[in-house]
């Protein structure tokens, strides 16, 4: 009789341990699925256009892209061919374009990468070759401050000359540019 009770106790313990193992295994699998699902995008977009206005109701900035993918877990939006129209205090529109862009929601920044171009909208719409342009490989645009920064090499071309530098800060709302290092300029009036 004692052996039957011992055998019954052993079988009950084995079944209990087996059920606990199955629960732990399925919980781990479910958690992995939830984590991998949160890394997936929640929407894709074609022809993105986003406008921001000042408190007075004036257009401050417009962001456009041919394609966008939003990742909610990272609070990140990837943009293809982003184009930013930033309007300065005098009403002039500056255009920032690149091949790729990454909008970080928490930092309120837009990182433009690959063939970044900054130029006045008037020149882009004129149909003539650009007379004033700024080129670099990467530029971080701080959307709230209307400020753009890079630590990469920069080339500024104008009708009268050329400036090469490493790093710059552009205050788009004030039309001011500060070059950070290795500045070389050529001017021909």
Predicted regions: what they are:
Residues 1-189:
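Mature-chain termini and adjacent capping regions
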């Amino acid at each position: 009789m004692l052996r039957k009770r011992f055998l019954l106790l052993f079988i009950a313990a084995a079944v209990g341990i087996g059920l606990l193992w199955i629960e732990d295994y399925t919980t781990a699998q479910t958690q992995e699925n939830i984590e991998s699902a949160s890394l997936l995008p929640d929407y894709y977009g074609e022809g993105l256009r986003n406008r921001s206005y000042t408190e007075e109701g004036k257009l401050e900035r417009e962001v456009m892209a041919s394609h966008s993918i939003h990742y909610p877990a990272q609070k990140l939006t990837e943009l293809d061919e982003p184009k930013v129209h930033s309007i300065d205090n005098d009403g002039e529109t500056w255009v920032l374009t690149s091949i790729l862009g990454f909008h970080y929601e928490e930092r309120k920044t837009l990182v433009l990468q690959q063939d970044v171009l900054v130029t006045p909208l008037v020149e882009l719409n004129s149909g003539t070759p650009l007379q004033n342009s700024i080129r670099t490989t990467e530029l971080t645009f701080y959307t709230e401050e209307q400020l753009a920064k890079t630590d990469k090499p920069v080339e500024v071309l104008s009708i009268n000359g050329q400036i090469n530098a490493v790093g710059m800060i552009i205050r788009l709302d004030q039309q001011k540019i500060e070059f950070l290092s290795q500045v070389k300029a050529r001017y021909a009036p």
